[in-house]
A protein has these predicted regions:
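M16 family metallopeptidases and their MPP-like homologs
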Residues: 1-9, 16, 20-116, 147-171, ...
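Short, surface-exposed beta-strand/loop micro-motifs that present aromatic residues
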Residues: 87, 182-187, 236-242, 299
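Short, glycine/charge-rich beta-strand/loop segments that flank catalytic centers
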Residues: 93-97, 127-139
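An aromatic/glycine/proline-enriched structural segment found at the starts
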Residues: 117, 121-125, 138-141, 158-166, ...
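Non-catalytic, conformational "gating/processing" segments within enzyme and secreted inhibitor domains
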Residues: 123, 130-131, 145, 149-150, ...
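PPIase-associated folding chaperone regions across multiple families
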Residues: 133, 262-270, 287
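Short, charged, amphipathic alpha-helices and their helix-cap/turn boundaries
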Residues: 173-177
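Extracytoplasmic/secreted cell-surface and envelope-processing proteins
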Residues: 204-208, 262, 319-321
Length: 390
């Protein structure tokens, strides 16, 4: 908790090469790199703003020196040279994943370069990436939807890391330690904590040996013990109010289930009875009938905890040019929820929702990228692949 946002920072700098990729002269670059690491620790420990600024200037000078003997975008260029596309990465609540597409005949070259990426990475241009991440944070603060989402998360998962953005806390973004980023990499980027997902025109039996000789070089060691967090003990009603966004809304949070739980799919169906893409849910009907402006219902199932989120926006009265009260909108939503709980749902709607969910799954599985993400999530959530795919 002292160094939040490390997983996301790491996602950014994992594109900057290694001691072999991205360097013109590692013998010259390495001592400069070590000085940069030490200077970030020194700056983090310094409380005097003037001295901090002076250290920052030293880091800038060292970064310029390192840039003269390095090519920080060489990894991306290598991927592009073999026909690779869509090179990117993302960090979520439970994982960071790196992805791209490439021609099947380049599989051997891809395995070599991609595995090399995770061997002795060098976090070049850390200074500029810090600015990029902080700009990402600032854009989020200017977005009322993002501020509202962050507020809801902070209450929905209070006491758990899910309660905060993957970007990290602002005080940590302002006071980074490159040494902690390296420690995070060494702790968590191990063979037992990673998975390789290949989807497309590949024969697993033919390339298994090549995978073993490339990705098999990753260090095999135990990861630190994962901290566990008790789930919220929700009793009765707890209400929070904040002036966020451009118009009023009510968001009701209920304890859900983690990903892979036997009740995950039943809960998704139950929430789809309130809101779905075909607009046949109880909240959808309220919106169509002019009782509310709009409504939504969804299950957020993470690896450790889950939440049911039901949101409604009060009806806007065009004649009086004002919204109805949040209390009125909440009352209508609770009535719709109770109807579902009482089983006041026609069978055809339930069957239509299940059919639509199956159709959407089949459509998603038509794209290799989506199929890879589904397999990845199954691994992260320790789900049975047979059940996930069927």
């Amino acid at each position: 908790d002292r160094y939040t946002g490390l997983a996301h920072y790491l996602e950014h700098v994992m594109f900057k090469g290694t001691d072999k990729i991205g360097t013109l002269d590692w013998t010259t670059e390495e001592p400069i790199y070590q000085q940069i690491i030490a200077k970030y620790d020194e700056m983090a420990d310094e409380a005097d703003p003037v001295k901090k600024e002076a250290i920052g200037k030293e880091i800038n000078e060292l970064t310029i020196q390192a840039g003269k003997v390095s090519v920080s975008n060489e990894f991306s260029n290598l991927m592009e040279s073999m026909g690779g596309k869509n090179l990117n990465a993302a960090t979520g609540m439970d994982l960071t994943y790196y992805h791209n597409s490439f021609p099947a005949f380049q599989i051997n070259k891809w395995l070599e370069i991609s595995s090399q990426r995770f061997l002795n990475p060098v976090f070049r241009t850390f200074q500029s990436e810090l600015e990029t991440v902080y700009e990402e944070y600032n854009r989020g603060q200017d977005n009322p939807w993002r501020v509202q989402y962050d507020f809801i998360q902070s209450k929905a998962y209070e006491g758990h890391p899910y309660s905060r953005s993957v970007l990290g806390l602002p005080e940590h973004l302002k006071n980074p330690r490159l040494s902690q980023l390296i420690k995070f990499y060494n702790d968590w980027y191990t063979a037992e904590n990673m998975v390789l997902v290949l989807v497309g025109n590949v024969n697993a039996n033919q390339i298994s040996g090549r995978i073993a000789s490339t990705f098999g070089r990753l260090p095999q060691k135990a990861t630190p013990e994962r901290k566990t967090y008790p789930d919220l003990n929700i009793k009765g009603r707890t209400q929070y109010t904040a002036k966020i966004g451009q118009y009023p809304s009510v968001c009701m949070i209920y304890k859900g289930v983690p990903a892979g739980h036997p009740d995950e799919k039943p809960l998704e169906i139950a929430l789809a009875l309130l809101h779905n893409s075909s607009a046949t849910g109880a909240l959808d009907k309220l919106s169509i009938d002019g009782e509310i402006t709009n409504g939504s219902a969804s299950l957020e199932a993470n690896r450790q905890q889950g939440r049911c989120k039901i949101a409604v926006t009060p009806l806007y009265d065009e004649n009086q040019r004002r919204f109805e009260s949040n209390k009125s909108a909440e009352k209508k939503a609770l009535k719709a929820i109770q109807q579902i709980a009482n089983g006041e749902v026609e069978d055809w709607i339930i069957n239509a929702i299940k059919t639509n969910m199956c159709r959407e799954f089949d459509q998603v599985m038509e794209a290799s990228e989506n199929k890879a993400l589904i397999l990845l999530q199954a691994f992260i959530n320790e789900e049975d692949l047979g059940q996930v795919l069927n």
